[in-house]
């Protein structure tokens, strides 16, 4: 027994343990490596006896402390076959703290370190603690070599039998397959590169381990960063490098050191390089300084590897980086150990800024298919299950995609190794569907068969979760209970290593074998532990963004935790979790449901690309189809992925989710590092419609993988592969794959640096892609010869419609033929031939070869090529090197190339000499519409028009029309040709040659010339004026910016005499804008046949042309008297009519006088306009004087002293009235007399407008005094002149002195109007309207005085003048006149609140006799008519009548006053009053009043509220009014009793002439009363009973009652139900009514039978003037009957909606033709289709014609509109809701100028287009008096309608009728 055994106190137990372990020395060695990672198991121990070696190893374990010893004992009991009695003794003795003696613990701790870590860690002192010893060079070299050998030996010992992962199965240790490595093309020289690792990675160039380091001195970067996602094998590769170096493969390095940041993070102090190497790795046996000096001197042969750079702790405060990161930074930058090589491994993320910009970046991309197969072969080498494993991987696509991650591939192999012997082939699909179940099966595989240690798993999971939450990945023995350490070691869940934080500070650390395993165990704990509730659980289900640089500085440790939680939420995992949860299946189910619910919420949110990928992983792990479907459907149509790495597993997961989606999706991968085999994951994804990749990482291998996937994507329409490194090899794969994708519509290979031949290879597939619309080959530099080859492809390929090449751009646009699916499936050769045949028939090609360095010989080749090709839409060769010859060749070829739209030769070096050649070359080109050449701007553009035979189809013409109208009037129709030679430096010497070259163009169409921006000067302008007649009829000539003087400009005015085509000359002198134009409508829009040929439109435009005046517009020009004199002298010979428009900054009085003096010399002048011209205050008087001096002036309009217009009569017009407008001219009182004196010299002034001046009250007073001298016969407008009530009262006082004033109106409110209307003769009666005058009480007496003196004033209206009831009563009492009638109308807000009683009380105060009273509460109006002098009533008679009134004292007094005042009352009107609100007191008073009104002739009570009792009172009063001639009770709703009372009141009313009972409900009893009373009314002239519910029986009785009414003139029975029977009775009596003038039977259900009888009767009504029979089914028979003999005095005929046809309507029209009295006709809503409604003879009085909704078409409208000229009085034409088109509009536009009284035309809901509307606008412009033409709901685009309305406001396109005011002066 050794001493230790003796001290244990149980020698027998120790011996048993030694004997047990001696049987399995390999197991003990493995445990020694686990618990003592740096233990040296060298050959020196092999000489010992096996039992002694075991004792030595146990001693080493024992001295580590109780935790290690207890963990070891637990491992012994778990893993070895220990007898039960021995296991109990071992656990009871050593398995707990009390079994470990403190003495031995102390003894173990006191042993020297060399015994603890023999062979690896030698005791040493720090580098700085020993004095420097002098050694010779040889000794230094020996020491260094000894250390280097020690370093290599220690590495050999470490990797002798395994790679990292101690305790794992043997198979794990032997398998190593290098992953795919790709080197980045650029280093970290940008912040983006530092963040992500540069995404521009070479594809297809794998990097081997030996290639990672460039050993050439001073060549390449010294720092290498290895980037790879979790599980890619970064740590494994780092240890592999150490192993390779230990085996002598990396001879370029003498020393290699490997550090892990997870351990370095534990260092809290700053380290020197020697401390890093010797204290934390391996210390020399002696003389550390000498060894370090050697390493420093040979640093270029030293390799430092840092694993887990992403785990480096970033600085948290302002103190800078941590100690280890600082040291790492200095090593990378070369400030420490300069020249050494540094390699760091990291996950993609935000890397520290300390990395140098030139650091080499290498990406680890995991396994591709061959590597997975190789790994499986190695793993299962020499095992019978190898083939089975390969089969499983081949059949299980999901498992195969998971194996792209090397760590998962290792786990998958372990699971297959466990599953294959016990399961049938193909079970992996069910057992290993995702990553979570891989780990679950791994746990089951590592567990003892049939036994799952649930508590240990959950406890270890709790440790894992605690580590994730605290950021801890290294655990010590104190952190994990010994049984858990033993459990982790036994099941290969934990790995151990030596943690050295300084000299002498070393201890064993534990970590989970992989971070993902730690996350999986944490997820197990969360899902199965009873300590965790579901609310806590859901907090861990989050999505982590991979854009780490934007969110956090360090990658999280729980990135996969949500994925594992989602995977454990799968139903498949429930039995496993329930077992872990001790059978608590309900709790597990609730947690699973909670996880799924969180994922459902996340699925419906808008997520970034990285989170979408994370979500897809989580959803895919759940294996829930419903959740997958929800996620797939919630993904956006455009799904972008930008600037974050994606693996093949990511894309495979995305594909799995998309399988649950129905709608197509667009995937865009921009800047995402992708593995070369990534596209394989998209195989069979039928939901992808657009697929786009943009990454330098994509190369040939990527393209090859993509070519295999593309044919399987059935919906793919767009493929983009931009910015890649694809070569010819990769493109060849894609070219072979593209024809297998016939559904592709767009393909992009932008920015791929493709060669010429590769580009040509690509375009070869164009005929094989029948639906392709776009091919983008931009940013792939090609030569000119290749470009011409591509042009040939564009010409020959039948589907290409555009080739666009400009510098880097190269794009094909195609128009695939419309083909069915069956056609697409036919043989390719048949498709190609069909396509060529169709293309030859209809294709047009656009060719844009801009800035392509084309020369003259290239142009020749291109012309030859294009002549063989299809029609060309556009050819753009701008920016090349064609020069004069090349441009000439292209211009000559233009007519042969059939270019439809544009030829652009800009920026091709054209000279002035070349301009002439080009002009001659295009002279014979019939289709040229415009040529624009500007040598200064290097512009040469040819615009072409379609040939006439190519313009087919009405739809094309309509589309052309709309486009034309949108351009009017500034743009040109296709029939014109415009030649623009601008900024070409042309001088006078060039003109003759130019005009010769232009001669051929002048005869091809209407020519527009533009010579602006040249250098013609005065000589050139004069010479051009001589040459212009030789050029024929131009449409316009632009001479702007040619340096002309004022003399030359005025000289151009002579062209009016020499050029017949010149209609308008616009000159802006200062800006040198000079434009000569013809008539804009004489461009002959129908010349080419491109527009419909309307004879009416052509005739109308011809008429317009004859009437259009010539116009000279001269602006920005100094208008001095000499210039004006010369100008007028030049204009003498100008043919007329002439409009002269002048504009300058200021026009002096002398210049204005000169201009006005010259007016008599210009008899052809029709308009003189001074716009935007400053005029002096004297100008109003100068202009006013012209009204008398120049008889041709008919209107002067001066506004604001800046705008003046003079309108002149033509020579044919007779002298007539004139008008003057002087608004906003600052006229005040001092100017009034002078102005009135000048106006008094006029013969006849129809209107004078002095509004918006400064007259004030004093100026107005002065003006009113001068009024008698001014011969005004129309309107005087003085609005907006700052007047007050004083002026209103003065106007009243001056009315007696103004005999010709007929009406005056004053509004002092916001309207501020003051208008006086005159007549030519003295007016007997005058009307004055005063509104919002705010009269005060003191004004009432003055108002009354004025009214009393103005005896000719017969009517006064006071609207809202602040007169209360009291003031109104005073006014009525004060007004007194000698004799005559006077009406006062008051409208005040209080009138609607005042009762009838109070209003009658006001009337009682009148001084004259009240003859009429009218009260309307809702209109707030009281009207009183007074008669003077007042006739006093006999007091005794009044007292007698009062005695019979049952009224109170106050009411009796009021009745008495009324009886006196209203004794002569003849009319009492009450409208919309309420007689119920005062307990019938008003009706009682009215009863009393009616009893006294012996002269009352008219009583009206309409639309009012009266109680039954009140009606009885009124009926009683009315019963005594025996002289009543008119009774109106319409629009009331009385009950039957009240109605009967009123009917009884009609008894004895034999003098009644007019009776209106409309809307009263007349039942049989009330109607019987009425008919009985009617039979007594022999004087009745008008009876209105509309809407009284009268039937045929009632009509029969009514007819009998009317037999005696021989004086009846009007009968209105409309909208009853009399029917044919009632009409029959009525027809029998109508001939007996000889005075009948108006009958209205509309809406009475009369059919054609009744209508015929009625027509026969009406023929006998000789005096009939108005006949209204609408809304009855009369039909043509009735119309024919009426037409046989219409009454000769007929004025109004209304037959709307009468079921008339063309025959009936035409018969009526013929009967009405030439009717001298007809004023209105309505045939609306009848069918006139095919009928021609025409009037041949004049209808002199016809004012309105209504033909709404009569199905009138263009043909019918032609004759109808021609008839309108026979109706000189026509004011309203209603043609809405018909079928009128542009032809009808043209006809109407032709007659509009001839209709002087027409005010309104309704053309709503027709078929008029923009052309028709424009023609109507042109018709309005001819001086029509029309106020509005309504065009709502015609097929006119909104923008076009707005444009037309801006040009002509009287065109109304709105739904509501917004009629503008008529133009002033009409």
Curated annotation (Swiss-Prot):
Ranges where the NACHT domain occurs: 222-539
Residues reported in the UniProt entry to bind ATP: 228-235
Outcome reported for the amino acid change (mutating residue 361 to I): In a breast cancer sample; somatic mutation
GO molecular function, one term: ATP binding
Keyword entries, A-Z: ATP-binding, Cytoplasm, Immunity, Innate immunity, Leucine-rich repeat, Nucleotide-binding, Repeat
Region annotation Disordered: where it falls in the sequence: 105-135
Job description of the protein: Probable regulator of the NF-kappa-B and type I interferon signaling pathways. May also regulate the type II interferon signaling pathway. Plays a role in homeostatic control of innate immunity and in antiviral defense mechanisms.
Family affiliation: Belongs to the NLRP family.
Protein's UniProt name: Protein NLRC5
Organism: Homo sapiens
């Amino acid at each position: 027994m050794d001493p230790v055994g003796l001290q244990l106190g149980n020698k027998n137990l120790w011996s048993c343990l030694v004997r047990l372990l001696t049987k399995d020395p390999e197991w003990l060695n493995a445990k020694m490596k686990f618990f003592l990672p740096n233990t040296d198991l060298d050959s020196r121990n092999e000489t010992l006896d096996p039992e002694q070696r075991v004792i030595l190893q146990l001693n080493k374990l024992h001295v580590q402390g109780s935790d290690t010893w207890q963990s070891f004992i637990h491992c012994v009991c778990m893993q070895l076959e220990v007898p039960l009695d021995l296991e109990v003794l071992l656990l009871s003795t050593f398995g707990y703290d009390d079994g470990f003696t403190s003495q031995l613990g102390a003894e173990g701790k006191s042993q020297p370190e060399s015994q603890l870590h023999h062979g690896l860690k030698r005791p040493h002192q720090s580098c700085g603690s020993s004095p420097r010893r002098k050694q010779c060079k040889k000794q230094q070299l020996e020491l260094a070599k000894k250390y280097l050998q020690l370093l290599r030996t220690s590495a050999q010992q470490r990797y002798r039998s395994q790679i990292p992962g101690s305790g794992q199965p043997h198979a794990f240790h032997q398998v190593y397959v290098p992953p795919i490595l790709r080197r980045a093309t650029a280093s970290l020289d940008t912040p983006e590169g530092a963040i992500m690792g540069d995404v521009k990675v070479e594809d297809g160039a794998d990097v081997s381990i030996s290639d990672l380091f460039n050993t050439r001195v001073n060549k390449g970067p010294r720092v290498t960063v290895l980037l790879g996602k979790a599980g890619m094998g970064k740590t494994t590769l780092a240890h592999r490098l150490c192993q390779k170096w230990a085996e002598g493969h990396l001879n370029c390095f003498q020393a290699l050191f490997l550090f892990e940041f997870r351990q370095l993070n534990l260092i809290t102090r700053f380290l020197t390089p020697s401390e890093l190497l010797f204290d934390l790795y391996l210390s020399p046996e002696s003389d550390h300084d000498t060894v370090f000096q050697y390493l420093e001197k040979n640093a270029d042969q030293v390799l430092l590897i840092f694993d887990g750079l992403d785990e480096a702790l970033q600085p948290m405060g302002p103190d800078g980086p941590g100690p280890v990161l600082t040291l790492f930074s200095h090593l990378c930058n070369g400030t420490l150990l300069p020249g050494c090589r540094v390699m760091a491994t990291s996950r993609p993320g935000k890397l520290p800024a300390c990395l140098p910009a030139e650091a080499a970046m290498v990406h680890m991309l995991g396994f591709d298919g061959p590597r997975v197969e190789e790994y499986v072969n190695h793993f299962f080498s020499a095992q019978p299950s190898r083939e089975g494993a390969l089969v499983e991987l081949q059949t299980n696509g999901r498992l195969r995609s998971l194996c792209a991650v090397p760590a998962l591939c290792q786990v998958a192999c372990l699971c297959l190794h466990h599953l294959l012997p016990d399961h049938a082939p193909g079970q992996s699909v069910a057992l290993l569907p995702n990553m979570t179940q891989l780990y679950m099966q791994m746990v089951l595989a590592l567990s003892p068969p049939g036994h799952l240690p649930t508590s240990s798993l959950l406890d270890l999971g709790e440790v894992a979760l605690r580590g994730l939450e605290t950021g801890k990945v290294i655990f010590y023995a104190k952190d994990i209970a010994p049984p858990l350490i033993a459990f982790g070691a036994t099941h290969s869940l934990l790995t151990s290593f030596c943690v050295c934080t300084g000299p002498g500070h070393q201890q064993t650390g534990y970590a989970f074998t992989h971070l993902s395993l730690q996350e999986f165990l944490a997820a197990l704990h969360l899902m199965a532990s009873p300590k965790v509730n579901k609310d806590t659980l859901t907090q861990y289900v989050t999505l982590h963004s991979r854009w780490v640089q934007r969110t956090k500085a360090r990658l999280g440790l729980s990135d996969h935790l949500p994925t594992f939680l989602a995977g454990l939420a799968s139903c498949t995992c429930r039995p496993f979790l329930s077992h872990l949860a001790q059978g608590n299946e309900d709790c597990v189910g609730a947690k699973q449901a909670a996880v799924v619910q969180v994922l459902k919420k996340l699925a419906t949110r808008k997520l970034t690309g990285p989170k979408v990928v994370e979500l897809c992983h989580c959803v895919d792990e759940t294996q829930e189809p419903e959740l997958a479907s929800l996620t797939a459907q919630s993904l956006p149509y455009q799904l972008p992925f930008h600037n974050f790495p994606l693996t093949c597993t990511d894309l495979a997961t995305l594909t799995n989710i998309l399988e649950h989606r129905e709608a197509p999706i667009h995937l865009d991968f921009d800047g995402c590092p992708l593995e070369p085999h990534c596209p394989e994951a998209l195989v069979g994804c039928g939901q992808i419609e657009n697929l786009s990749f943009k990454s330098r990482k994509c190369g040939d291998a990527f393209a090859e993988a993509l070519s295999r996937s593309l044919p399987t994507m059935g919906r793919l329409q767009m493929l983009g592969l931009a910015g890649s490194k694809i070569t010819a090899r990769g493109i060849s794969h894609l070219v072979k794959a593209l024809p297998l994708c016939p559904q592709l519509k767009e393909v992009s290979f932008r920015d791929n640096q493709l060669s010429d031949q590769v580009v040509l290879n690509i375009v070869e597939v164009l005929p094989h892609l029948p639906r392709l619309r776009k091919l983008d080959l931009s940013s792939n530099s090609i030569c000119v010869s290749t470009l011409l080859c591509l042009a040939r492809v564009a010409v020959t390929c039948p589907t290409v419609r555009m080739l666009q090449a400009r510098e880097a751009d190269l794009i094909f646009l195609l128009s695939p033929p419309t083909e069915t699916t069956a056609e697409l499936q036919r043989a390719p050769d048949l498709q190609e031939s069909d396509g060529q045949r169709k293309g030859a028939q209809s294709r047009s090609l656009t060719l844009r070869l801009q800035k392509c360095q084309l020369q003259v010989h290239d142009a020749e080749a291109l012309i030859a090529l294009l002549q063989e090709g299809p029609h060309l839409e556009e050819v753009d060769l701008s920016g090349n090197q064609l020069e004069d010859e090349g441009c000439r060749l292209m211009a000559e070829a233009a007519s042969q190339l059939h270019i439809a739209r544009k030829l652009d030769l800009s920026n091709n070096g054209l000279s002035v000499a070349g301009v002439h050649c080009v002009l001659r070359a295009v002279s014979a080109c019939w289709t040229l519409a415009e040529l624009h050449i500007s040598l200064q701007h290097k512009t040469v553009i040819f615009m072409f028009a379609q040939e006439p035979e190519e313009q087919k189809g009405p739809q094309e013409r309509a589309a052309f029309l709309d486009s034309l109208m949108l351009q009017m009037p500034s743009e040109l129709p296709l029939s014109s040709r415009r030649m623009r030679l601008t900024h070409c430096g042309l001088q006078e010497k060039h003109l003759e040659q130019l005009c010769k070259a232009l001669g051929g163009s002048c005869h091809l169409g209407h020519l527009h010339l533009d010579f602006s921006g040249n250098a013609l000067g005065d000589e050139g302008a004069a010479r051009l004026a001589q040459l212009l007649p030789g050029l024929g009829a131009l449409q316009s000539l632009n001479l702007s910016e040619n340096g002309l003087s004022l003399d030359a400009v005025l000289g151009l005015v002579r062209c009016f005499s020499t050029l017949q085509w010149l209609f308008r000359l616009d000159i802006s002198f200062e800006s040198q804008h000079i434009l000569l134009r013809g008539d804009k409508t004489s461009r002959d829009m129908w010349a080419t046949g491109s527009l419909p040929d309307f004879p009416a439109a052509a005739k109308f435009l011809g008429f317009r042309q004859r009437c259009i005046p010539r116009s000279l517009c001269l602006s920005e020009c100094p208008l001095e008297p000499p210039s004006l004199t010369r100008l007028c002298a030049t204009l003498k010979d100008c043919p007329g009519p002439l409009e002269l428009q002048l504009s300058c900054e200021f026009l002096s009085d002398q210049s204005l006088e000169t201009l006005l003096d010259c007016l008599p010399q210009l008899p052809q002048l029709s308009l003189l306009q001074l716009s935007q011209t400053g005029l002096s205050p004297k100008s109003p008087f100068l202009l006013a004087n012209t009204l008398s001096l120049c008889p041709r002036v008919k209107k002067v309009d001066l506004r604001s002293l800046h705008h003046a217009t003079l309108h002149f009569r033509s020579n044919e017009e007779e002298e007539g009235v004139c008008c003057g407008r002087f608004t906003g001219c600052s006229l005040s009182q001092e100017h009034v007399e002078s102005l009135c004196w000048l106006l008094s010299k006029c013969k006849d002034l129809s209107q004078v407008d002095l509004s918006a001046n400064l007259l004030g009250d004093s100026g107005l007073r002065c003006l009113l005094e001068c009024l008698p001298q001014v011969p005004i016969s129309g309107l005087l407008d003085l609005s907006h002149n700052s007047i007050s009530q004083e002026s209103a009262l003065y106007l009243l006082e001056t009315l007696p002195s103004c005999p010709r004033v007929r009406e005056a109106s004053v509004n002092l409110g916001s309207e501020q109007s003051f208008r006086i209307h005159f007549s030519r003769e003295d007016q007997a009666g005058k009307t004055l309207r005063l509104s919002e005058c705010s009269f005060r009480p003191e004004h009432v007496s003055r108002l009354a005085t004025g009214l009393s003196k103005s005896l000719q004033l017969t009517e006064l209206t006071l609207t809202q003048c602040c007169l209360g009831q009291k003031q109104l009563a005073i006014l009525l009492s004060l007004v007194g006149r000698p004799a005559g009638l006077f009406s006062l109308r008051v409208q005040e807000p209080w009138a609607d609140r005042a009762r009838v009683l109070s209003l009658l009380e006001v009337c009682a105060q009148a001084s004259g006799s009240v003859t009429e009273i009218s009260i309307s509460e809702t209109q707030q109006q009281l009207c009183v008519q007074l008669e003077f002098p007042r006739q006093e009533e006999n007091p005794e008679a009044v007292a007698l009548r009062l005695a019979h009134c049952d009224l109170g004292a106050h009411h009796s007094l009021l009745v008495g006053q009324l009886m006196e005042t209203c004794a002569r009352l003849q009319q009492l009107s009450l409208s919309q009053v309420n007689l119920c609100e005062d307990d019938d007191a008003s009706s009682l008073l009215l009863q009393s009043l009616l009893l006294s009104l012996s002269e009352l002739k008219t009583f009206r009570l309409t639309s009012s509220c009266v109680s039954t009792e009140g009606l009885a009172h009124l009926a009683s009063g009315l019963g005594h009014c025996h002289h009543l001639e008119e009774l109106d009770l319409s629009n009331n709703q009385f009950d039957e009793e009240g109605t009967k009372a009123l009917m009884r009141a009609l008894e004895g009313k034999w003098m009644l002439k007019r009776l209106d009972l409309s809307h009263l409900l007349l039942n049989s009893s009330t109607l019987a009363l009425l008919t009985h009373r009617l039979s007594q009314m022999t004087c009745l002239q008008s009876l209105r009973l509309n809407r009284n519910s009268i039937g045929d029986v009632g009509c029969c009785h009514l007819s009998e009652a009317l037999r005696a009414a021989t004086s009846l003139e009007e009968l209105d029975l409309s909208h009853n139900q009399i029917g044919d029977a009632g009409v029959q009775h009525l027809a029998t009596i109508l001939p007996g009514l000889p005075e009948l003038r108006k009958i209205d039977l509309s809406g009475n259900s009369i059919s054609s039978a009744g209508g015929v009888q009625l027509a026969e009767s009406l023929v006998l009504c000789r005096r009939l003037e108005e006949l209204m029979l609408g809304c009855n089914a009369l039909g043509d028979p009735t119309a024919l009957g009426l037409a046989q003999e219409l009454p000769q005095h007929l004025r109004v005929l209304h037959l709307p909606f009468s079921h008339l046809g063309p025959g009936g309507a035409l018969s009526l029209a013929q009967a009405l033709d030439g009717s001298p009295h007809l004023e209105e006709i309505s045939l609306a809503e009848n069918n006139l289709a095919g009928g021609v409604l025409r009037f041949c003879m004049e209808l002199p009085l016809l004012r309105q014609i209504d033909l709404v909704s009569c199905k009138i078409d263009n043909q019918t409208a032609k004759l109808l509109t021609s008839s309108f000229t026979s109706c000189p009085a026509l004011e309203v034409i209603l043609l809405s809701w018909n079928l009128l088109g542009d032809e009808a509009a043209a006809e109407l536009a032709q007659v509009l100028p001839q209709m002087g009284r027409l005010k309104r035309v309704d053309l709503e809901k027709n078929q008029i287009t923009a052309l028709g509307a424009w023609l109507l606008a042109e018709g309005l412009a001819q001086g029509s008096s029309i106020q509005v033409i309504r065009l709502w709901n015609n097929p006119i685009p909104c923008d076009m309608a707005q444009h037309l309305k801006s040009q002509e406001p009287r065109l109304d396109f709105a739904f509501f009728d917004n009629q503008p005011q008529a133009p002033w002066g009409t």
